[in-house]
Amino acid sequence: DLLVLPNIPNAYTRERAKDELPQSASGRTIMTTEPKFVPNEAVEISLGDNADVRVRMIDCVGYLVPGAEGDMDGDSPRMVHTPWAENAMPFREAAELGTKKVITDHSTIGMVVTTDGSVTELPRENYEEAEERVVAELQELGKPFLILLNTAAPYSDSTESLRSELEKKYGVPVLAVNAAQLKAEDIRRILERMLYQFPLRELRFFFPGWVETLEQGHWLKQGLTDALKGVMAQVEKLADVEQAIGVLRETDFLKKAYTDRILPGEGAAEIALDFADGLFYQILSETVEMPIE
């Protein structure tokens, strides 16, 4: 409601999307009952100068944790009807099946929400098994994802210690947040970090046309080719692009290297290269064998 809804141009569609937002509450009771697409159609938002994305969230029940309430009807499992089976099934089973279908069939990227136990009445250890299962499934499928550590104290030493521990354990970014107090800029930062987990399939480099006219084997063209090949060998996902640019900036003949555009949907990044001052005239002088300024 802070970042996506304001970018829906049609007022009626915007109000309908607001009415369809999932409910939330404190305590142990499960609020989500089925996978829900919010909004119904993807909305384009800007994440800064270099990236525009189309966003649609799928809210899932997830995997139930010990102590959660809402999956039982008295002493018996709560039975529910789903689109995936003719007969009613236990709510717990339906929740897991729906979550798996979303992860496998409908999502392009995942946001795993876990907690240190400070935002519910349940201790941290109750969440660990479900957390590990979801992360393992995403890793097995190769889906890019990050983890949100929901906590009442995102800046405390104990939270930072747990955040760092989870990051090392799972090998993905872990962001400590207080979900109830998130601002638009916080959400934008989360989306940026999440999108940068997409695999990098293509790096596009832009530089002056005169460089392309140089003969094969020319020292500058060869040096540029070697530098770009070296960079390509070091990058696997969009998050690695800035590191690659840092390497290029140390190249003697380049004055500047910067990200021109990030295209998460294509798994591509566009990098602009500016050559050192005077290099054009230096090359021209070498070519005609006389000084040109």
Predicted regions and their residues:
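Conserved G1/Walker A P-loop phosphate-binding module
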Residues: 1-84
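Conserved catalytic network of the ASCE P-loop NTPase/AAA+ motor domain
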Residues: 46-51, 102-106, 137-142, 167-168
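Conserved nucleotide-binding/hydrolysis micro-motifs of P-loop NTPases
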Residues: 62-64, 116-119, 152-155, 180-183, ...
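Conserved ATPase-coupling elements of RecA-like P-loop NTPase cores
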Residues: 66-70, 121-126, 156-160
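Inter-motif core of Ras-like GTPase G domains
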Residues: 69-121, 136-138
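Charged helix-capping and loop-helix junction motifs
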Residues: 126-132
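Canonical P-loop GTPase G-domain recognition
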Residues: 133, 137-146, 151-217
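P-loop NTP-binding site
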Residues: 192-196, 203, 208-293
